[in-house]
Each structure stands twice: as structure tokens, then as C-alpha cells.
Amino acid sequence: MKLVAVDVGNTSTAVGLWSDGRVSRVSHCDGGFDEAKKAALALARSSGASCVAYVSVVPKADRAWRAFAKARGLAFRQVTYRCFADKKGGKIPLSSSNSKLQLELGHGRGLSIDYPKPETIGADRLADAVGAVSRHGAPLIVMDFGTALTAAVVTRDCVWRGGVIAPGFPLMRDYLFERTAKLPQMKLGSGRAPKIGRSTEEAMRFGALVGYRGMVREIVAELRRNFGEDFRLVATGGFAKWVLRDLDLPFVVDPTLTLYGAGLICSREF
């Protein structure tokens, strides 16, 4: 099965071809809907894909993408908690609080959700967790380094237990510039922190890099203490490689994880 996988984030949109469990021909579009639409249309035409696998954290974009798919005769499947079935295999009731949901992935794998209000879980977090369990196995912590930093915890029994949401690195970087009178816009640079700041920009870079990596390290340590599990560590998102460089934790960086998870979910019949 071939799908055009679309991941709409707060600052950019990723578009890629999902075909029989593999993601290829990925475009990262920073120019808004028109640029991403062109990339998706080109993929659909050249690959013969029949469906859009859609994951979004921007609700106002949903209608435009649904209309795009309809206008071109493509099926439209959107990642939500309703892609999961209840424990009896039936449809999820409208009042879903405290329900236990699951998605079978084949080959004896699956992901269950044990969460008070599953309808509040971000679609990207669901796609990340499903993709990570399929590719890397449980138990794991999967972190998505985007505009926000999100983390999902999947325990050894393949159950999504909850997660963490924190400001993403670009929010930290931009807020210093926007909310102070004299601090400059910080450049990302190589991702290596200086030994100490010997200029304003170096001081900002040291604080941002060392401080942010310290936050990531402490989140992982606290989750390991709370659950008593030696979690695998999986990372995705546009800032993952940059933030994790030189961090003394064994993260596997998986750049196409969200697209892969979206395709995997939407390739199921639901």
C-alpha cells in the first residue's frame, strides 16, 4: 500500500511517501500549505498513492488538507485516538474517558493506551509512539524535538502510559530575543557549547545548549526512576540531532518516525 504521509507541525510540514512500511522522498516545507500541497501532489502523481495519511497539531489546517485529498480523488485518513479500538475490538464510544484502547500492528506487536482522556493526546504523539514501538520495541521513551518538546512513555507491556510536554528549543531561543531589549537573536551554530561564554552570543549559546540538554537528561532520569525501567531512548523532530549532539545518553535519532507512524496507523482498516 502506498500513502502520501503528511505531518503538519507548528513551524513546518513534512511530506513523504509511505510504501509497505518504508518512508522515502521526504520534503520539509517551511513555506506553508501551498508548498506542502505541491510536494504532496507530486508524490501522489509519481507514486500512484491512493491515500493521504495525515497527522497534524494545527487544527485549522485540517480542512484544507481534507479538501486537497477530496479534489484529487485521494482517500483521507487522519491520525486520532479513534484509530485505536476498545478492548473488545469495537468502535470507541463518544464518552471515552478512562477507556483502554489498543492498535494491533501485526507480527505480535501492538500498542495500548491507558490514559484518562485519550482524546486529548496529540496526533503526533500517537504517531511517534506507534512508529517507535514498531521500529525499536518497548519499553521506550520517545521524544519529539520540535516547537514543543514532547515525550511519550511506553512500558514493557507496550502500553502508552503518558508523557511530558515542555517548551521546545526554538521557543527558548526566540523568547530571549523577543522579550529582552538587548539580547540578540541566537544562531544555532554547530551544536557544540563553548567552554564558557566570552561574548553575549556565546553566553546565550552555552545557557541554551547546556541548560536544554540538562532538562532532557533530567526528564529521562526522572522517568526511569518513576517506572523502574531501562527505557530505550528514541528521538525525532527537527532539532533532535542538534540538541542531542554530545549528550551522554544513548538516543537513537529517527528523522522519519512521525511519518512512518502515521503511515502505519492509516494503513490499517479502521
Report the location of each language-model feature:
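N-terminal glycine/serine-rich phosphate-binding loop of ATP-dependent small-molecule kinases
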Residues: 1-84, 88, 92, 100-102, ...
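Glycine-rich phosphate-binding loops at beta-strand->alpha-helix junctions
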Residues: 12, 55-64, 206-209, 229-246
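Active-site regions of enzymes building and remodeling cell-envelope glycoconjugates
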Residues: 70-77, 116-118, 248-256
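Active-site neighborhood for divalent-cation/phosphate handling
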Residues: 81-90, 107-142, 148, 161, ...
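Glycine-rich phosphate-binding/hydrolytic loop that grips phosphoryl groups
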Residues: 89, 181, 251-270
